[in-house]
Amino acid sequence: MKPIKAVIFDMDGVLIDSEPVYLHHQYTHLKPSYPWITLESMYPLVGISGQEYMPFMAKLCRRTDDAAFRQEMDAMNAGCRVYYPDILRKEVRPLLHELKQMGLQVALASSSSRECIEQVLTQCKIRELFDCIVSGHEFTHSKPDPEIYRFTMDKLGRKPEECLIVEDSTY
């Protein structure tokens, strides 16, 4: 087995504990207009890909996935204000520093938008600890498709057997 030379992190659910915050925001926003929605019915949103999000939400809300519905969902998501240092996992900063001190490359491969990624890393003051940052919005296929990981490894100049991926998803 070759030694690990790079560590690639997911962001939501790994670096930041964002899923409960996002889920609660969406639930409290949707419940008045869609009273049949329960918090439990929204659990599949945790870890959902960008491509699956709108079809899932349309089905959940019993709506057509059209421009008006997408506008409603975009407005809801834009209204979610999070102070990311509050949800940064406490072990993240020391771990990133230790990995860098060990001479390892550190990368981020997240399904989140570039804008969201930059906001999280900047607010948490960890941006400079990453050698490579990749947004899933730059790809045709979302996770679990390995395209984002292959691209990240290529940017790092690494082979799969030289990389460790830290991900919270079960796929």
What are these regions (language model features)?
Residues H25, A107-A109, T152:
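Small-residue (primarily alanine) positions within well-ordered alpha-helices
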Residues S18, L45-V46, L108-A109, E167-D168:
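Small/polar loops that bind or transfer phosphate-bearing groups
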Residues K2-E98, M102:
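N-terminal helical cap/lid subdomain that shapes the substrate entry/recognition surface
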Residues I8, A107, L164-V166:
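Conserved hydrophobic packing residues within short motifs/helices of P-loop NTPase cores
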Residues I37, T64-D65, V106, E128, ...:
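Residue-level detector of short coil/turn "hinge" positions at structural boundaries
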Residues M1-K2, Q101-L104, L156-E162:
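Glycine-rich phosphate-binding loop signature in dinucleotide/nucleotide-binding domains
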Residues V14, S110-S112:
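Conserved phosphate-coupling serine/threonine residues in phosphotransfer and NTP-handling enzymes
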Residues P85, S113-I165, T170-Y171:
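Substrate-recognition "cap/lid" segment bordering the active-site pocket of phosphatases
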